């Protein structure tokens, strides 16, 4: 797979438009998507999974952090540092598909669920909807409220919570065979 550029923090914080990889520390899985696997939905969506392979920064594993609101309680566009509690979108890079795709969450339903776990489904959406809006939350629930508004550091354990469903992104250890080339 072709390697793509990703961001390195110069000041120890995440910034808008940084390009990052997302990992699940519990399962040691890296978040990846497959534009060859469309999901069954009314909208254009593509499968998302995690891989235990060390693929490095490639088109399917790098996401760009996009600001959702021009002005929020944490500041305006002039503030480039991402803070806990801010709304963010994770967007595909231009190296993998002809248009941007947005990481989204679809709640569990009769026609929408994860392939094996039967839980809510993560997928890449072609449309910018509220289902593609996330907040970055502190991992420790005892300090989650206190950390709202403080800068997010790369490589710091954190949670991604979907704004539309209020569910946290996650993965399990179920093995699904995908052929990534």
Pin down the residues of each PLM region.
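Lectin-like carbohydrate-binding module/patch detector with strong preference for beta-trefoil
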Residues: 1-181
């Amino acid at each position: 797979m072709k390697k793509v550029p990703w961001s390195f923090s110069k000041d120890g914080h995440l910034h808008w438009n940084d390009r990052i990889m997302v990992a699940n520390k519990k399962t040691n899985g890296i978040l990846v998507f497959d534009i060859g696997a469309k999901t069954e939905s009314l909208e254009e969506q593509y499968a998302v999974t995690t891989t235990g392979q060390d693929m490095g920064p490639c088109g399917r594993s790098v996401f760009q952090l996009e600001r959702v609101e021009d002005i929020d309680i944490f500041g305006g566009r002039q503030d480039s540092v991402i803070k806990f509690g801010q709304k963010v979108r994770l967007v595909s890079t231009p190296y993998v598909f002809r248009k941007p795709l947005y990481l989204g969450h679809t709640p569990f339903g009769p026609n929408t669920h994860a392939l094996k776990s039967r839980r809510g489904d993560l997928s890449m959406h072609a449309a910018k909807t509220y289902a593609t809006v996330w907040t970055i939350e502190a991992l420790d629930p005892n300090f989650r409220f206190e950390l709202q508004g403080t800068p997010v550091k790369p490589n710091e354990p954190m949670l991604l919570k979907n704004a539309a469903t209020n569910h946290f992104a996650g993965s399990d250890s179920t093995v699904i065979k995908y052929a990534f080339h």
